[in-house]
Swiss-Prot record:
Binding site for substrate: 19, 106, 117, 323
Protein name per Swiss-Prot or TrEMBL: Acetylpolyamine amidohydrolase
Residues binding Zn(2+): 195, 197, 284
Active site (record annotation): 159 (proton donor/acceptor)
Cofactor annotation remark: Binds 1 zinc ion per subunit.
Species for this entry: Mycoplana ramosa
Site label Polarizes the scissile carbonyl of the substrate, positions: 323
GO annotation (BP), single: epigenetic regulation of gene expression
Key words, A-Z: Hydrolase, Metal-binding, Zinc
Length: 341
């Protein structure tokens, strides 16, 4: 299984995160990718290549052009405005406010942000582009006939919606990969999100589309980030009616329960007729993850990989979350072992 990985992820190295009323070192940091890369190499997945550079043709089909222009220019505009720290949103277009987009950078950050823990820092745009490129190259491998590939993306992407960033995400890598597969000739693609946190950005992008089935297994949004999407009754709209499946689960969920949701989601994906599955892989379902509340163990990730691989369709694994403990590398490697058989 080929691994696509860009060293440019290091350009995204924010120093602050708003968490629990404090500015703390971010949970989403460069060492995450280094731990994962070392572990997958040690597990034998050592065919690691850097992605090619890609333009915006594919990403413009899933993200708003104005939003992408904002991301590209935000840091320079923030500094030009005289602000000293990293760019953190402080005001938001909440209920019953104007739909107009502000012209100044402070207002625009609030307009395009869905979660204030995520600062924009130097190199954010460049790192996001490199992460997107890893997803595109992974999709190209699947389109070329590979049975599986791993896009070791950082920063992650599944909280990035059509025109919003947050949850450490800026460009939705899984969505871009799915779009790339469609552009290469596929008619139906599934995105299976196994991160602890609901893929609200991915749902936002595909909720009214009928060519991508989105399934998400996640912590109940009544008590877990991102809070405002991810309920079971959200099943799609218009052309996308019936193409979203949410599986919210409560505190302490073990694999015995989580695995039942996985099995059901794969049945739904098979009924949809997906020609490939993009797996949004977060290992923050791990029992020791510092910002989650599921109870999966390291061996469970091998079972997870085997179960997904049993679907029989090509798999592109795209890295999402998993924080704070060295076992994130082992757990990712275990998923790949399960996929590889």
């Amino acid at each position: 299984m080929r691994v696509i990985f860009s060293e440019d992820h290091k350009l995204r190295n924010a120093k602050t995160e708003l968490y629990g009323g404090e500015l703390v070192p971010p949970f989403e940091a460069p060492f995450r990718a280094e731990w994962i890369l070392a572990a997958v190499k040690e597990a034998g997945f050592d065919d690691v290549v850097a992605p090619a550079r890609h333009g915006l043709e594919t990403v413009l089909k899933v993200h708003d052009a104005g939003y992408l222009n904002f991301l590209e220019t935000a840091w320079d505009r923030w500094k030009a405005a005289g602000y000293k720290g990293e760019a953190i949103a402080t005001s938001f277009p909440v209920r019953r406010t104007s739909p107009r987009i502000p012209t100044d950078i402070e207002g625009q950050i609030g307009y395009y942000c869905n979660a204030a823990e995520t600062a924009i820092s130097p190199g954010t745009w460049e790192a996001a582009l490199s992460s997107m490129a890893s997803a595109i190259d992974g999709a190209d491998l699947i389109a070329a006939g590979h049975k599986a590939a791993f896009s070791l993306c950082r920063p992650p992407g599944h909280h990035a919606g059509i025109d919003m960033f947050g949850g450490y995400c800026f460009i939705n890598n899984a969505a871009v990969a799915a779009q790339r597969l469609l552009d290469k000739g596929a008619k139906k693609i599934a995105i299976l999100d196994v991160d602890f946190h609901h893929g609200n950005g991915t749902q936002d992008i595909f909720y009214e589309r009928g060519d991508v089935f989105f399934a998400s297994l996640h912590g109940d949004p009544a008590e877990a980030f991102p809070h405002f999407l991810g309920y079971a009754e959200e099943t799609g709209k218009g052309a996308g009616a019936g193409t979203t499946a949410n599986y919210p689960m409560g505190r302490g969920t073990p694999y015995s329960v989580w695995g039942e949701a996985l099995t059901d989601s794969l049945k739904r994906i098979a009924a949809f007729g997906a020609e490939a599955i993009v797996v949004s892989l977060g290992v923050d379902t791990f029992e020791q993850d510092p910002i989650s509340f599921f109870k999966l163990t390291s061996p469970d990730y091998i079972t997870m990989g085997r179960t997904i691989a049993a679907s029989g369709v090509p798999l592109l694994v795209v890295m999402e979350g998993g924080y704070g403990v060295p076992e994130i590398g082992l757990n990712v490697a275990n998923v790949l072992k399960g996929v590889a058989g």
